[in-house]
């Protein structure tokens, strides 16, 4: 919340607190440690800490980060993937992801920690307490949810919630030693969310494989069906549909980013750190920007058969337009998948059926390709003309994306 008021109510009445303008505000630059790790297993230890600093707006300082990792007993595992770490080491990485960005911030900031000591050994607990005290001395605010008596001793104020939901508060003066923190560094803007998604896909291309394999299977089936179809004008609509079906399938497959965001609540961490509009970025990062282009040309090459060279040249000249719309359709499909995944019952049939709306732009593109095959490309804006059909398909896709991204509340 960036505007409005937060009021305490002890009368047992539930009150909805929200932005006075009805929108979620951008609150960035803070530290966050969830009770679950909030990390993807395909990240390396160093990438995670550096990424947390980048998304908080801190400049790169590889040497300083490696020194911090060494102090926390993670120096020798800096290039290891998080999935290969033990539970205790993963917890250290999650805690550092919250503490380091704030420690490098010269301006007062906030750290939110949920059971940070859970799974830490005694040495790491000591480091945690020392860092908490040092951050507090620098003027940073720290909010900790914990049942650990050791962590409670590091706090200046203790708020206890009883079984009957009554709040009690007391102030104490902690006498724990203060750790030596790294020096703050300058602010710097990064597109870390995009870099994170691209980095994980390069390392483990499950999205490309997950889209490519069904598309190739569909292409083989389309080719089998097309062998008995006469290449004449009365069959152009069927040939157009068979040509576009494989590339359409690449667009509507569930993107791998859904799985990556659901892993250990990584999506919750990124949503909190990225601020408003994160779903829009997720939908863009959840698409394959390259696969539709070669797939649509390959599909036409396989399906075209003995079509005349003149028609073949006309179609080949404008197939990139269909690939462009398919890429946008893939963004809209990813947004719909993300919207459904956020529902309480994400696997419900009603949620899955939302994907059926994507058939409409597919039919518009099929109509456009049929017209190009019959009469060549036309830029008239009348209904039924190729360019008009492609434009309608694109506008439909944009509206579907806006519906999935803008309308639902974060």
Identify the meaning behind each predicted range.
Residues 36, 41-57:
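Q-loop/switch helix immediately C-terminal to the Walker
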Residues 12-31:
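ABC ATPase NBD coupling module
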Residues 222, 226, 237-258:
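Long, hydrophobic alpha-helical segments
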Residues 50, 62-77:
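Conserved ABC ATPase "signature" region
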Residues 145-147:
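H-loop/switch region of ABC-family ATPase nucleotide-binding domains
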Residues 114, 121:
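ABC-family nucleotide-binding domains
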Residues 81-88:
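Conserved ABC ATPase signature
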